[in-house]
Each structure stands twice: as structure tokens, then as C-alpha cells.
């Protein structure tokens, strides 16, 4: 075989190791084949779909280990695919990642998808890159709402699923019932007969085995899963391999060395570095023309520069400055854009403002509206589920997304980068239909809870204008409650639910549709304690205020007038002085100088604070602190604007 044909595979003669080929052909022998033995590698593209915490990323780690992507002596971090700090801390996958393994002479490109509906914008894009999907389901929990969200998208684009029942060793496993639930789910999502005839595997991603029988054998590792992928998933459906180059951008990232890097599957033709390309928008308009500086292919968890890529392979290209997600990257001779997957609209919005508190600029180094604007628009470039709008005054920005989790992750990321900003309470995106009726987003909510706590859950959900559609036992003295509830009623309910159920409830949400406005929902029952002066909080003053309600600050913490320092025990706001020191006298008496014992404060996490604040309050976020404050810091301004709001109502 001539060398040029060898390079089409992405291989170069010196890089081929005998260990890899020995592994692929099953001999384990350490030999390097002659050039004539190397064939153009076949390709399979698959996505792994699963709910949060059902073991998707762990399974990918095991696939990488067992297919020889790591050396035997290489130390490998757990959950290799979750490379983002926030992903590791929260235990969720936020960004879609691509990797590849080689099995029996076939390159299997695997895409790890986010399982959370807030990050569904990623999911829809990557489904257009793959030809099959592994639906990973927990043997105890069964298919969950987010599984339904992604599976529905996958079935709609015609993917043929493989169902893998994971965590089969769980003592509360019920794999037979779960298989029936999966079948019912597929049927309810209008799956075709071919899609309903899905193969099933059982196993444990953590222990590194899968088999067609729940009891094993376990000594074959994940080989049955990889073999099934080769049999069941079709080869990439590509256009003309010798035709003009065309590719849809599905993932976007900014690289400090390469600039914009676009990942996608090549639809037709081939591409080489330094080749001229143009970028078409969805309506066929030319966005830019340029040259490809580098082509990167996924090999294991590494990205390797290659000399040529062909139709069907998933690659990343660099060298263009304007092309983005859902655009068509193509040869200059192409005139029509490829059709891209539509993306669901955002449902929640919030305001990002320049931090104008008296403590602004003391803890972060990125505080101006210009750097905040640049950072938000840069985020929106790579995250199509986000929408950014500027206010008229240019000092605040309206950021819309899929849910408060997605926005909280963005705020936490910016905070770690050194930004200081103020953010408002999340608000729901409403719109009017053709008759002028106000419509609001409704979500399907599934809550698994112990039977003894089901009453309080139903009561709290009905207060939030939710309608219960289903109540059924889910095994182990637990019940599954299904509601349709307005999105605005669910903001902040997660922490309250955990308190009501002593941490035993699991809540999952999924966007359902838009329905007519359900009416007002009562908000927070308590008022707040506001500092009336600026300085450092004093333990003596805080001790004397404990009867007024719990504090959310500690002694010695810097405060300013208008900052929230505690939760009032009544429903009105109260201004207090937390700076008042003990009166010093020269008269001594027994027991006067005892140490002050304070009740520990309630610490507000970012997620909790976002949902706790009201419409007239802001959360001040800095790299070191999270502070809560009133929108108007001056007491007279608050009274004046409060009266104006009442008059408008």
C-alpha cells in the first residue's frame, strides 16, 4: 500500500506500536505489521446517554483502560472525561467530550454527553455527529426524566439504541422491572419497531464488565459491549467521499494557542491542513473564508494532529475566527448549508450587573463592565443554550439559559477566574401566544421520596401551583410522585425539599411545554436583617440581635449599609446595627466579662443564595465571598421606590 494511502488512516509508520496491534488482533504478541497489512480503518460513532450519576463517565474510563488507551504503568485519574473542576466537584458532566478507542481494527469514536437537562444544548448538537447510542440505566433507579430528555432527542434523529443496565450489583437492583420501564419509555417517545428491538447488556462500569446475562460471566470485561457496538451500530452515513468537503460545527472551544477550535463530523469529502474553506450560516450566507491551520483527531483521551481526515470521522479544526456552532464548514465550491439540529429556547433569565457595593474591587481584579461583557459573550460563543442581551445603559446584561443550575455554574466559573459582579434573582422567560395570552414554561417534575414524607411534598408542590399526575410505589417504602409545575415555582425548591424530607428525596426536572400563566405564587415568608452602617461586625452586637433571627455573617466580617446580615423572624425587613461594641467602663462586676457564645451563622452557598433572594435584592459575588444586599443600599431610596412599586401594582 503506498504511503499516501496509509496516511489517510491517520497512522504514520513510526507511530504504530506492536502492543496496540497485538491487542487489536487478540494475540497479545508484540509485533509491528508490514505496511501492506495496514488497512484503512473503519469507524463507528456512538454517544453514551445516561442520567446524572448512573455511571456514564466511569464506564468511558473503563473502556479506555481495557482497549489499551493507557499504558499498563500509567497512573489514571478517576473520571478522566470530567476534566472541568466544577464537573468533578458537582459530580456532573457539563461539557460534551469526545474520545476514541480502537477495537478489532475499528476506531470507535465515543462522545460523552451531559445528563442534565440544563446542559441539553450540548446534547442536541452532538447527536448529529453519531450513528448509535448506548443508553445506560441504573438497575435500581430505572430511566429518569433527563434520560427521557436525551433519549427522546436520540430517537427523533433515528439512532438505534443499545441498552446497558449498569450497577447490576446493587442490593436494591430490579433489572427486570427496569427493562420494562425502558421499553415503555421508548414506546411513549414514538420509537420505531426497529428501535424498540434493542439489544440489552447487564454489568457494572465500576467493576469493568458487561454481559448479555445479569450474572455474567465477568471475566470477559467490556469486550461484549465493544463487540455489540461493532455489530449493531452502522458505519457513518456519509455523502460522497470523493466530493467537496462539508462539516457541521457541533462543539466550540477557545484554545490559547490555536484560537477557535471547532469539532464536528465530516459529512463528505476530505480535508488537509492549509486547505481553503468557507463558512456558511443556516440560511446559506457566507460568514467567512479562510485556511485550516490544524486538524486534530481524538486518539484515546489525547488529541493528535493528523495530515488528512475523511468523511465519517470526528475531528477538530483550527484556523477560522468567526465560524461557530451549527454553521457549515465547507469547500469554497459548496453553496448550500447542511441542516443542523434545532435547539430548545432558554427558560430562565437573570441580570448580571457591575458590582457597585462599597467593597467593590477589594477581592477581585475583573470588575469593569467591559471585561464582564467580553467574558459573557465569549461564553455564549461556545454555549448555544445561553443568550446574552445588553441593557440600554451598558452596565448590566440579561443572561438567559436552560435553568438555574446552568447559570450557577457560569457564575461559579467566572468567580474562580477573578470576576466581581452582582446578580439578580433568576426570573422565568414568559411570552404571549397569538391571542395575547401570557404563557409560562411548565416542567415535568419526578420526586422519589420515603412514604412518610410524601404528604409534605404534595402540600408544598400544590402551593407552587403544581398538578400531580401520578403517584406510585417505587420499592423499599418509597413512592414516586410526578407533577407538572411552573418553572418559577421550582426556583429554590430543591433545598426546601431536602429539609422537609431529611435529605431522602430525589427531584428531577424536565421542560414540558408552555401553558397559560398559573397565577401568583407566594415567595419567601421571612424578611431580612439589614446593616445600617459600614464596618466590621462585632460579636457583642450580634449576640444581642439573636432574638431577631439567625445571622448569615460571622463576627469580624466586613459589612456595609444595605447589606443583608441575617434572616428576620417576622415578615418585614429590619435595619440593625451589628457594629455596636460593648460599653467600656472602669467599674468591674462578677460575670460581666464572660465570653460571648454565638449561634453558628447560616452559610449561604451560591445555589441557595440565588434562589433565596427576592426581586429587590442582589447577590454580590467575588472570588472570596458571597454577600447578599438590597438593590438600593440607601434606606430612603428603598422607601421611595417601594412606594412607587406599590402605586404601580
List each language-model region with its residue ranges.
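Structural and coupling elements of P-loop NTPases
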Residues: 11, 17, 24-25, 30-649
Amino acid at each position: 500500500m503506498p504511503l499516501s494511502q496509509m496516511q489517510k488512516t491517520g497512522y504514520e509508520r513510526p507511530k504504530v506500536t506492536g502492543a496496540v496491534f497485538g491487542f487489536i488482533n487478540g494475540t497479545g504478541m508484540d509485533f509491528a505489521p508490514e505496511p501492506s497489512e495496514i488497512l484503512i480503518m473503519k469507524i463507528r460513532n456512538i454517544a453514551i446517554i445516561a442520567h446524572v450519576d448512573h455511571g456514564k463517565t466511569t464506564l468511558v474510563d473503563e473502556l479506555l483502560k481495557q482497549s489499551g488507551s493507557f499504558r499498563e504503568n500509567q497512573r489514571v485519574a478517576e473520571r478522566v472525561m470530567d476534566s472541568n473542576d466544577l464537573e468533578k466537584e458537582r459530580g456532573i458532566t457539563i461539557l460534551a467530550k469526545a474520545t476514541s478507542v480502537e477495537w478489532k481494527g475499528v476506531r470507535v469514536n465515543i462522545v460523552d454527553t451531559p445528563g442534565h437537562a440544563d446542559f441539553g444544548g450540548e446534547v442536541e448538537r452532538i447527536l448529529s455527529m453519531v450513528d448509535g447510542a448506548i443508553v445506560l440505566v441504573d438497575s435500581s433507579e430505572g430511566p429518569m426524566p433527563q434520560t427521557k430528555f436525551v433519549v427522546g432527542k436520540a430517537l427523533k434523529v433515528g439512532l438505534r439504541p443499545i441498552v446497558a443496565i449498569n450497577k447490576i450489583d446493587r442490593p436494591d437492583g430490579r433489572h427486570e422491572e427496569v427493562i420494562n420501564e425502558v421499553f415503555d419509555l421508548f414506546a411513549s417517545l414514538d420509537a420505531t419497531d426497529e428501535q424498540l428491538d434493542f439489544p440489552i447488556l447487564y454489568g457494572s462500569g465500576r467493576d469493568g464488565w458487561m454481559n448479555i446475562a445479569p450474572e455474567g460471566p465477568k471475566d470477559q470485561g467490556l469486550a461484549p459491549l465493544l463487540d455489540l457496538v461493532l455489530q449493531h451500530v452502522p458505519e457513518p452515513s456519509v455523502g460522497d467521499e470523493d466530493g467537496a468537503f462539508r462539516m457541521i460545527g457541533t462543539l466550540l472551544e477557545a484554545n490559547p494557542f490555536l484560537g477557535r477550535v471547532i469539532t464536528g463530523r465530516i459529512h463528505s469529502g476530505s480535508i488537509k491542513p492549509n486547505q481553503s474553506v468557507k463558512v456558511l450560516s443556516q440560511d446559506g450566507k457566507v460568514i467567512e473564508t479562510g485556511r485550516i491551520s490544524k486538524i486534530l483527531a481524538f486518539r484515546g483521551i489525547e488529541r493528535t494532529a493528523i495530515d488528512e481526515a475523511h468523511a465519517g470521522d470526528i475531528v477538530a479544526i483550527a484556523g477560522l475566527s468567526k465560524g461557530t456552532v451549527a454553521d457549515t464548514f465547507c469547500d469554497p465550491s459548496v453553496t448550500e448549508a447542511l441542516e443542523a439540529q434545532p435547539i430548545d429556547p432558554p427558560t430562565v433569565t437573570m441580570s448580571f450587573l457591575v458590582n457597585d457595593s462599597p467593597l467593590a474591587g477589594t477581592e477581585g481584579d475583573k470588575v469593569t463592565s467591559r471585561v464582564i461583557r467580553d467574558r459573557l459573550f465569549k461564553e455564549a460563543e461556545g454555549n448555544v443554550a445561553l443568550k446574552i442581551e445588553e441593557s440600554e445603559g451598558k452596565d448590566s446584561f440579561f443572561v438567559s439559559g436552560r435553568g438555574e443550575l446552568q447559570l450557577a455554574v457560569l457564575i461559579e466559573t467566572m468567580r474562580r477566574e477573578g470576576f466581581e459582579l452582582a446578580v439578580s434573582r433568576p426570573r422565568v422567560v414568559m411570552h404571549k401566544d397569538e391571542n395575547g395570552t401570557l404563557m409560562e414554561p411548565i416542567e415535568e417534575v419526578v420526586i422519589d421520596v420515603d412514604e412518610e414524607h410524601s404528604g409534605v411534598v404534595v402540600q408544598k408542590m400544590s402551593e407552587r401551583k403544581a398538578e400531580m399526575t401520578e403517584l406510585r410505589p417505587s420499592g423499599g417504602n418509597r413512592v414516586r410522585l410526578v407533577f407538572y409545575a411552573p418553572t418559577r415555582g421550582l426556583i429554590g425548591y430543591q433545598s426546601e425539599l431536602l429539609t422537609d424530607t431529611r435529605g431522602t428525596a430525589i427531584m428531577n426536572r424536565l421542560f414540558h411545554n408552555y401553558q397559560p400563566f398559573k397565577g401568583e405564587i407566594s415567595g419567601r415568608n421571612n424578611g431580612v436583617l439589614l446593616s445600617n452602617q459600614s464596618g466590621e461586625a462585632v460579636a457583642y452586637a450580634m449576640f444581642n440581635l439573636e432574638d431577631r433571627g439567625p445571622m448569615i455573617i460571622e463576627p469580624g466580617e466586613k459589612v456595609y449599609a444595605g447589606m443583608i446580615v441575617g434572616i428576620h423572624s417576622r415578615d418585614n425587613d429590619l435595619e440593625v446595627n451589628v457594629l455596636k461594641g460593648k460599653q467600656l467602663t472602669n467599674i468591674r462586676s462578677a460575670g460581666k466579662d464572660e465570653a460571648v457564645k454565638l449561634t453558628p451563622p447560616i452559610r449561604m452557598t451560591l445555589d441557595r443564595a440565588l434562589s433565596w433572594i427576592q426581586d429587590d435584592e442582589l447577590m454580590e459575588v467575588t472570588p472570596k465571598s458571597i454577600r447578599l444586599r438590597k438593590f438600593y443600599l440607601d434606606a430612603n431610596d428603598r422607601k421611595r421606590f417601594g412606594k412607587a412599586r406599590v402605586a404601580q401594582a
